[in-house]
Design a protein with these regions (language model features):
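Selective transmembrane helix interface/packing segments
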Residues: 1-242
Length: 242
């Protein structure tokens, strides 16, 4: 069982536990996301003349066509929310990838791995997204119009709509956590297999290579799914028909 390093501090008189490895990995993920996005979008020209700009434009069209336009009105909301979709999908894709390609540990403590395999992180991220969708709903509809949607179907339905918000939060966070955590568990089992003699080492190494490749694919798919779900929730909050 791997050890973790925690820092306990006080906030408003309450003990707050900070997972140091998660903080380190989050900072690394943010830094890598910033560097990669800046690299892809720097020196943009009207006529693409580099593979880097072609890759950036391909990603831009993919996000706008498959994530944003498919869920919200592009002219009314999409142009202002496009950067949000890019940020979410880039951050989560990189976060998922880090755990597959990199693991930094010392004295039994894992300092760098997939933060999306930490349920606390995915819950916090999902909570941030849910709060953002409510904020967007209030921004585009106004406070009175937005909160009237909770009673428009009858006051008896209101408690169920509130419960739905909590179930969305839990399923949103656990879906990402479950997929990434399961992949890391299997990677750990395959790594253990490499220590069980010659044939175990061969089988374990082959399995690790195959599963790492598959995990990279799953990581990108989960980043895409998380971003699409974000915009589905967002469309429910800002669209007039909801």
């Amino acid at each position: 069982m791997e050890k973790h390093t925690y820092l306990i501090t006080k906030l408003f008189g309450y003990d707050i536990t900070v997972n140091i490895p998660s903080v380190i990995t989050t900072l690394i993920t943010v830094l890598l996301t910033f560097i990669i996005v800046m690299f892809l979008t720097s020196r943009i020209k009207l006529r693409p003349d580099s593979k880097r700009q072609n890759a950036a434009e391909l990603l831009a069209y993919f996000i706008s066509d498959n994530v944003v336009k498919g869920n919200v009105n592009w002219k009314k909301y999409g142009k202002g929310l496009w950067a949000t979709a890019l940020t979410i999908i880039s951050f989560i894709a990189i976060a998922n990838t880090i755990g597959v390609l990199i693991e930094v540990s010392y004295d039994g403590v894992v300092y760098v791995n997939s933060i999306t395999a930490d349920p606390t992180f995915t819950f916090s991220l999902a909570l941030l997204i849910i709060v953002f969708t409510h904020f967007a709903g209030i921004k585009y509809k106004g406070v009175k119009h937005y909160f009237s949607t909770y009673t428009s179907s009858g006051i008896g339905i209101t408690p169920f709509k509130v419960i739905e918000e909590f179930t969305n939060l839990m399923t949103f966070s656990m879906r990402l956590f479950g997929n990434i955590y399961a992949g890391e568990i299997l990677l750990a089992l395959l790594a253990t297999l490499t220590t069980l003699g010659f044939f175990g080492a061969i089988a374990g190494m082959v399995g690790l290579v195959v599963w790492k490749g598959f995990s990279l694919f799953i990581g990108f798919i989960q980043a895409y799914i998380f971003t699409v779900l974000t915009f589905i929730y967002l469309s429910h909050k800002i669209s007039d028909e909801h």
